[in-house]
Amino acid sequence: MAANVSNDNNQLLHTCFHLPDPFFQQVQHRYQSNLITGVINAIFAPFSATANSLVFLAILLSASLRSAPSCLLIACLALSDFLVSVIVQPSYVAYRFNENLHGYVNCAVRVLYANGFYVCYGVSFMTLSAISFERYLALRLHLRYEGLVTVRRILLVAMLIWFLNIALTSLQ
């Protein structure tokens, strides 16, 4: 009976919310790939953060770019990619290096990486889809495009994209 309670407590300590338990027993097989991908992400994250923040600020500070619906979607994409470079990539590096060094990854790192990944990459994918659809409308509708695709509607679409991804991630 006492052993059963102890096993239940150990299982509760090792669960990490909605995330499945990773298989750290095979860490030796992934050691080199973890090291390489961790180093690559650590090198490129600052460049990505800088580039995406410059794109976002350029659109935000320029009145002519802010008034173009397609530029607002690009700003939404730049914001999402900026968050990838400051949240997802560093947590990925921490995840892989902890896996290599300790054979275990803290639950907070796993949750930050997984939820940041789901939200940011979901937003990126949906924003790219919205950009494609907006460009299709620009080609297809010609003269009616400016009346149909407005800055206000694009902002609503961008807010809906963020809301949907955050809501769907939090439902897990």
How would you describe each model-predicted region?
Residues 46, 50-53, 86, 159, ...:
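Generic alpha-helical transmembrane segments of integral inner-membrane proteins
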Residues 87-91, 167-172:
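C-terminal TM-helix exit segments that contain a strictly Trp-centered aromatic cap at the helix terminus
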Residues 1-13, 75-87, 162:
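Alpha-helical transmembrane segments of integral membrane proteins, especially early/N-terminal helices
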Residues 119-159:
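Class A GPCR helix-loop hinge within the 7TM core
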Residues 30-46, 68-131, 138:
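Extracellular TM2-ECL1-early TM3 structural module of rhodopsin-like
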Residues 1-54:
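Extracellular N-terminal segment of 7TM GPCRs
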